[in-house]
Amino acid sequence: MSQSLLIISRQSPWSGPSAREALDIALAGGAFDLPVGMLFLDDGAFQLAPGQHPAHLQQKDLQANLQALPMFGVDDLYVSARSLRERGLAEERLALAVEVLDDQALRDLLQRYDQVITL
């Protein structure tokens, strides 16, 4: 039986390579049929904001990678309600369908996965 993997992405999509690396790990795990979940926490919630154009920062747009997650079997996608609220992001305007979790649900989520990677 495969061990489940939760990837916590805490960095904004334009602050460096961590956001892309987190997505790459999730996609690779999904490609190998591992049970993978992804949690967008803190500034990682900005990855879910629609209409980003990071080309002027010489960064690649991560939206295509985000949209590919379900195609690779990564269906368990979560975001912190607190992270959304603190960053002024509205759940109904996110670029990807995710489950919004309160603090207690986040603690419960961490207990459900065998391995956790934070980037």
From Swiss-Prot:
<dbReference type="InterPro" id="IPR027396">
    <property type="entry name" value="DsrEFH-like"/>
</dbReference>
<dbReference type="InterPro" id="IPR003787">
    <property type="entry name" value="Sulphur_relay_DsrE/F-like"/>
</dbReference>
<comment type="function">
    <text>Could be part of a sulfur-relay system.</text>
</comment>
<keyword id="KW-0963">Cytoplasm</keyword>
<comment type="similarity">
    <text>Belongs to the DsrF/TusC family.</text>
</comment>
<protein>
    <recommendedName>
        <fullName>Protein TusC homolog</fullName>
    </recommendedName>
</protein>
<dbReference type="Pfam" id="PF02635">
    <property type="entry name" value="DsrE"/>
</dbReference>
<dbReference type="GO" id="GO:0005737">
    <property type="term" value="C:cytoplasm"/>
</dbReference>
<dbReference type="InterPro" id="IPR017462">
    <property type="entry name" value="Sulphur_relay_TusC/DsrF"/>
</dbReference>
